[in-house]
Amino acid sequence: MGPAPLPLLLGLFLPALWRRAITEAREEAKPYPLFPGPFPGSLQTDHTPLLSLPHASGYQPALMFSPTQPGRPHTGNVAIPQVTSVESKPLPPLAFKHTVGHIILSEHKGVKFNCSISVPNIYQDTTISWWKDGKELLGAHHAITQFYPDDEVTAIIASFSITSVQRSDNGSYICKMKINNEEIVSDPIYIEVQGLPHFTKQPESMNVTRNTAFNLTCQAVGPPEPVNIFWVQNSSRVNEQPEKSPSVLTVPGLTEMAVFSCEAHNDKGLTVSKGVQINIKAIPSPPTEVSIRNSTAHSILISWVPGFDGYSPFRNCSIQVKEADPLSNGSVMIFNTSALPHLYQIKQLQALANYSIGVSCMNEIGWSAVSPWILASTTEGAPSVAPLNVTVFLNESSDNVDIRWMKPPTKQQDGELVGYRISHVWQSAGISKELLEEVGQNGSRARISVQVHNATCTVRIAAVTRGGVGPFSDPVKIFIPAHGWVDYAPSSTPAPGNADPVLIIFGCFCGFILIGLILYISLAIRKRVQETKFGNAFTEEDSELVVNYIAKKSFCRRAIELTLHSLGVSEELQNKLEDVVIDRNLLILGKILGEGEFGSVMEGNLKQEDGTSLKVAVKTMKLDNSSQREIEEFLSEAACMKDFSHPNVIRLLGVCIEMSSQGIPKPMVILPFMKYGDLHTYLLYSRLETGPKHIPLQTLLKFMVDIALGMEYLSNRNFLHRDLAARNCMLRDDMTVCVADFGLSKKIYSGDYYRQGRIAKMPVKWIAIESLADRVYTSKSDVWAFGVTMWEIATRGMTPYPGVQNHEMYDYLLHGHRLKQPEDCLDELYEIMYSCWRTDPLDRPTFSVLRLQLEKLLESLPDVRNQADVIYVNTQLLESSEGLAQGSTLAPLDLNIDPDSIIASCTPRAAISVVTAEVHDSKPHEGRYILNGGSEEWEDLTSAPSAAVTAEKNSVLPGERLVRNGVSWSHSSMLPLGSSLPDELLFADDSSEGSEVLM
């Protein structure tokens, strides 16, 4: 018959067979009709759909239905619609068919899976949506929904395919359908993508000190797990046995440069990290190309090119200057300056002199050699002094005025004299006339003609060089009479002469007698005033003296000393505070700014010497529950601040003593008033207050630089703060940060450490690991606390180590745990933070190094001019803001940000009938699907700001749980989700940032 009849027979018999199979399946499945065939449970299907439509529209069922009756039972992913037909038969519950549960495949492979459900024909416009990890997948074109209608039910199959899976495709996928306001959810399908190890943290290049230990970290993840790490140094393996990821390599020290890398192995193969170079810090090379940029009579401007920095940033440079004259004493003048901008103007030089100049720069290791010496000369200048001993004579016979003088000292001529300029002014009968005369360089006298008789002549003389005219001498006046003549006028600077010694001795004797007489009279008057305080002592000689009242002499100390002594503090502390005690009458107290368990801070006004009033902050103590030791510590903090003078360290204005109502003296410390309060509260308000304020990253870095400057100043003065935190840093009116609260600070007089000898309340989460163990404090302990403070600033006021109790901190740090990198924190900034938390205090940088690193990072960032330059976007993290003051204000920031550019509307859209998911397209920006937030309480912040606040309190933020470096994270915690501490560290606490324990 040939091949032609075969398709004809198939076309005749297959539809009949198919209808018969459907009828039999329906009869067997009653009263629960199911979709006939193997489609629902298969991972891939090859069946040709009878109907493939976006949605089954236009199909009119013959059955009547009503909504779900209240009180009818239904569970989980099952919807039980109540349908009434002509025969009033109830419909069975609806549910998705069981499908494959777990799919494991390699990276870059393709995968396809589906879910299916049989729905009565009475339900029209039913759609199936795909969800991944609680987020709806929108706009994906590889999701296809197929419909297979029958007489009573329609089988719906939704398939989802990914052409080339990636690690980000890991997750749980489900199907959702809504029927009669009931949501039906399918069983989850778990996709696990396996491949070569993926590095989440690779070793970083470092510059280390010679023979100083340092650590390198390498971390990689699968799946499959486990991932083992091998370390390689200069192409040779360091460890023969692998270490499980993450791995920390401790290098005891190097004497020469080395290259390190790490290898990550799992069952799929091996991945090699980038090679990093570890450089050894060395003394820098001397500067080169020292040149003269400009030269004047008393200054020289030089420039230079810095040499190799020895893998350590330059700190400062020294300019050495010595006179090139062989007759000079050979002394060297040294001028210190910052390393940048490689320019320096040398001042206070002599005019018309030759100098040899050399430059040397230093880094952390030491000073470089001096650059090659260069020769420089200053130019000629005008004389710096006037001629000396100017005298004027009148020669009536020749009708002339003779003038004599002495030339200025040679060193003060500032050049070669070319002559003198004489100014003579003639004044007579209200008429004034000034004339100028020029005299040659060899002259020391001059003669001028009399211009007017019966007049006054005023003469001044100035020396002249090629550099200009020097200052004029003091005026010398002589009167020219009409008849007769004056032959001499006193000089402006008379020459020293001999005086009669008898006259000198007599004058001194008379002076001593006069001084003694004045003292005697003043004492006598004072005594009389005291004796007559209670009566009249000046009676008549013949009167009878009945009672003589004499004022009792008091030998008490001054009131200030007595008040300080009554506090019971040590004599040493009294002497320190004596010169800063302020009269209580000069201070007016105002409202309370803050109050705690042991004291309060009040607003005040301090009267100044010029009559003005200064707004101040006054710290007081509650004497009811304060011991004598706490009072002395309170005043010791004031004594500590007395000698500080730095723009980034709060200064002491004074100490005031006030008698309380119980008659007990109460100390008060007077400090500058800070408009914006402490830094921690300011950061919290910027993030949690209604209508959060945006603080650019550049401003946060400026806060860190200010604190580093203040701590550098304290460290150089051998002071340990021991309580550095954001809450103890204050904000001035110009947004400058000041280090404050020196209640725990200590002065180091010998050595470089301080051992705490008694139990005290300490801020545990800011204390370095060695201080927790041994109660030993150094400046490097303050560096640790500075790193935690930087973390507070970067997170805008979050509490460090959330979920870790105070008594767990030492074990937590001992196991190598540290604060994690905050969201939106630059890698360079986190590296600076992390360097502050090195276990060995010697490995931590100094405050000078930290300041230079932060300034360099701040300079590398662009200036904040518009929203396009903003690096940080406020994500409005969820954190309780209870207890914050109402109506508080923040400092205005010179930045205008369009809310539309910060966050887009997250309002879920209406249900759509076609479910698609665009996955891994070949175009660069269309290769991933879009995740919907899935929260109905979010509103567009631009149109409803109040709704955004509601959403912040009641809904899960989009992206609140995210994946960073292969580990799930949460905004509410800086610890990885799912990670656990050691066995003894399994409990979280609800302590605040001020948590303290007894040490």
From Swiss-Prot:
Protein kinase domain residues: 587-858
Residues in Ig-like C2-type domain copies: 81-186, 197-273
Top-rank taxon, per record: Eukaryota
Domain Fibronectin type-III: 286-381, 386-484
Modified residue annotations for Phosphotyrosine: Y749, Y753, Y754, Y872
Post-translational modification: Autophosphorylated on Tyr-749, Tyr-753 and Tyr-754 in the activation loop allowing full activity. Autophosphorylated on Tyr-872 leading to recruitment of downstream partners of the signaling cascade such as PLCG2.
GO molecular function: ATP binding; transmembrane receptor protein tyrosine kinase activity
Role played: Receptor tyrosine kinase that transduces signals from the extracellular matrix into the cytoplasm by binding to several ligands including LGALS3, TUB, TULP1 or GAS6. Regulates many physiological processes including cell survival, migration, differentiation, and phagocytosis of apoptotic cells (efferocytosis). Ligand binding at the cell surface induces autophosphorylation of MERTK on its intracellular domain that provides docking sites for downstream signaling molecules. Following activation by ligand, interacts with GRB2 or PLCG2 and induces phosphorylation of MAPK1, MAPK2, FAK/PTK2 or RAC1.
Protein's name according to its UniProt entry: Tyrosine-protein kinase Mer
Native source organism of the sequence: Homo sapiens
